[in-house]
């Protein structure tokens, strides 16, 4: 898969950040500006895309509590919007959206998550609508 655009919501230092990606993307900024958090978000999304929300959150510093947007304890949902294609040779774009939260005070070894919105769209056609799933 080739990611064209990656939007992060309520993840670490990023309240709402969207970046355009090209074959070579350079991130430049001050210490504490969110460069490493962006890579953590990409890793988190990668684990989600492999099939298990539980894999996306391990022990601290990658626990859900440690990774949700740090400026507000009231924000509970983390989300990603991703525009991607199979490859540069197959440029048809897919749009994937997921918003989720951890439910209650979870057992660190077996947390429970709630997906509020998940969809995969191809040229405006919704391929996989979903929401309200407890995992």
Each PLM stretch: what is its role?
Residues 9, 22, 83-85, 101-103, ...:
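Solvent-exposed residues in well-ordered beta-strands and their adjoining turns
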Residues 16-22:
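Phosphate-binding P-loop
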Residues 89-135:
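Electropositive, glycine-dotted interaction segments
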Residues 35:
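Conserved lysine of the Walker
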Residues 1-14:
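N-terminal pre-Walker A segment at the start of P-loop NTPase domains
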Residues 39-106:
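Conserved P-loop NTP-binding catalytic core
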Residues 31:
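The conserved Walker
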Residues 27:
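Hydrophobic anchor at the beta1->P-loop junction of P-loop NTPases
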């Amino acid at each position: 898969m080739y990611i064209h655009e990656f939007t992060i919501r309520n993840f670490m230092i990023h309240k709402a950040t969207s970046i355009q990606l090209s074959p070579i993307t350079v991130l430049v900024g001050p210490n504490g500006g969110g460069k490493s958090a962006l890579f953590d978000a990409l890793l988190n999304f990668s684990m989600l895309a492999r099939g298990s929300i539980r894999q996306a959150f391990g022990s601290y510093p990658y626990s859900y509590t440690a990774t949700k947007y740090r400026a507000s304890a009231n924000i509970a949902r983390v989300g990603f919007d991703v525009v991607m294609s199979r490859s540069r040779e197959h440029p048809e774009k897919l749009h994937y959206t997921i918003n989720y939260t951890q439910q209650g005070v979870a057992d660190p070894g077996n947390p429970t998550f709630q997906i509020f919105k998940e969809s995969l769209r191809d040229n405006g056609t919704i391929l996989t609508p979903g929401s309200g799933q407890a995992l």
